[in-house]
Amino acid sequence: YPLLPLSDLFAKAVHRAQHLHLVAAETTKDFERKYIPEEQRHSHKSSPSAFCQSETIPAPTGKEDAQQRSDRELLLYSLLLIQSWLNPIQNLSAFRTSDRVYDKLRDLEEGIFALMKTLEDGGSSQGFAWLKFSYERFDGNLSEEALMKNYGLLACFKKDMHKVETYLKVMNCKRFAESNCTV
């Protein structure tokens, strides 16, 4: 991320977050079609195993909540969510393009650091260091248990990338109040 105007940094970060969310959604859908019987798809989403680790952090849960938070908080939560997936994504064989997804996560992480630095935050995430966590690695086994675990992880990845996308869009809209600003 070379020295770009703040509006361009936000635009790039939002675009990358949207792309990652789309990839996560498509991968989850492909995984469902390939491995998960129709009747299990709906029951799994309400089961306790569908719980995502990110739900344990005090991050905003929706657009309205995100609008009440500072840019610093939203950037830190976005960074935390992205970093929690860096390790597990490397092992995701369901992504035929796991290298590219990992690279895109790293790129978005770098973009968020650039935003933090530009916003005079210095890129420090010290205030949230105690919140660090990482998801389990994806299981390469094709047993039913492993498939359901991977399905849950994919659902969490999709949900977390949607959160990052929402946080970045909210910040972009607050700062630049574009007429076509939708979150």
Curated annotation (Swiss-Prot):
Keywords: Disulfide bond, Hormone, Metal-binding, Secreted, Zinc. GO terms for molecular function: growth hormone receptor binding; hormone activity; metal ion binding. Disulfide bonds join C52-C156, C173-C181. It is found in: Secreted. PROSITE patterns: SOMATOTROPIN_1, SOMATOTROPIN_2. GO terms for cellular component: extracellular space. Residues 46-56 have a biased composition (Polar residues). Signal peptide: none annotated. InterPro entries: 4_helix_cytokine-like_core (IPR009079), Somatotropin (IPR034975), Somatotropin/Prolactin (IPR001400), Somatotropin_CS (IPR018116). It comes from the Eukaryota. It holds the Pfam family Hormone_1. One of its GO terms (biological process) is animal organ development. PANTHER family: SOMATOTROPIN (PTHR11417:SF2), SOMATOTROPIN,PROLACTIN (PTHR11417). Belongs to the somatotropin/prolactin family. Growth hormone plays an important role in growth control and is involved in the regulation of several anabolic processes. Implicated as an osmoregulatory substance important for seawater adaptation. This is Somatotropin. The gene is gh.
